[in-house]
UniProtKB/Swiss-Prot annotation:
Name the UniProt record assigns to this protein: Transcriptional regulator SdrP
Alphabetized Pfam families for the sequence: cNMP_binding, HTH_Crp_2
Gene Ontology terms: biological process: positive regulation of DNA-templated transcription; response to oxidative stress
Chain residues forming the annotated DNA-binding region: 149-168
Induction: Increased expression during the stationary phase when grown at 70 degrees Celsius. Increased expression during the logarithmic growth phase in oxidative stress and upon treatment with diamide. Increased expression by heavy metal ion, antibiotic, high salt and organic solvent stresses.
Keywords per UniProt: DNA-binding, Transcription, Transcription regulation
Signal peptide from the UniProt entry: none
Assembly description: Homodimer.
Native species: Thermus thermophilus (strain ATCC 27634 / DSM 579 / HB8)
Length: 202
């Protein structure tokens, strides 16, 4: 008999997990559909995106080991998730370990960008990363991202006002077109060159 997979769904904007020591009802999840954003938020309300979890990825693994969680997990789009069992089988643990390794490599890349790249370069890298997620779709042959300036600020470790200036600069230079709650990528090649450029400082 085929075992029915347990799933749960959340709407875009829903908070799935909160910081703190996992409670008895907390679970680890695998993303089946949609995109989950993991963010740390300081006392002033400034957010920093730690990781984007795409379909096939995992989050909330602290619940399996009783470790404290330092982030919020928010549904960036409508999502469908599979809660993991409290005692995963070896194959699932192997998948989880591989995902954690990839997530650690991604975290290293984010730290490197924060330390070595100017904000404009980090923004180009963030836009390209978002273009490969469920937040992206195609209009008239161009990639369009559904993203607010607050979300972009969290993605690059900055604040909304500064990000708005950088978005305006990228638009004037022809890399993107900015609209209400969305960004159209006009020059992917140019954005890739920016993203690969180191720059200095912030």
């Amino acid at each position: 008999m085929t075992q029915v997979r347990e799933t749960v769904s959340f709407k875009a904007g829903d908070v799935i997990l909160y910081p703190g020591v996992p409670g008895p009802r907390d679970r680890a999840y695998r993303v089946l559909e949609g995109l989950v954003r993991l963010e740390a938020v300081d006392e002033e309300g400034n957010a920093l995106t730690l990781r984007l979890v795409r379909p096939g990825g995992f989050f909330g693994e602290e619940a399996l080991f009783g470790q404290e969680r330092i982030y919020f997990a928010e549904a960036a789009t409508d999502v469908r998730l599979e809660p993991l069992p409290e005692n995963p089988d070896p194959e699932l643990l192997k998948d989880l370990a591989q995902h954690l390794s990839q997530g650690l490599a991604e975290a290293y890349r984010r730290i490197e960008r924060l330390a070595t790249q100017r904000l404009k370069n980090r923004m180009a890298a963030a836009l390209l990363e978002l273009s490969e997620t469920p937040l992206a779709h195609e209009e008239e042959g161009k990639v369009v991202l559904k993203a607010t300036h607050d979300e972009l600020a969290a993605a690059v470790g900055s604040v909304r006002e500064t990000v708005t200036k950088v978005i305006g600069e990228l638009a004037r230079e022809g890399y993107i077109r900015s609209g209400y709650g969305k960004i159209q990528l006009l020059d992917l090649k140019g954005l890739k060159e920016l993203a690969e450029s180191r720059g200095q400082g912030r």
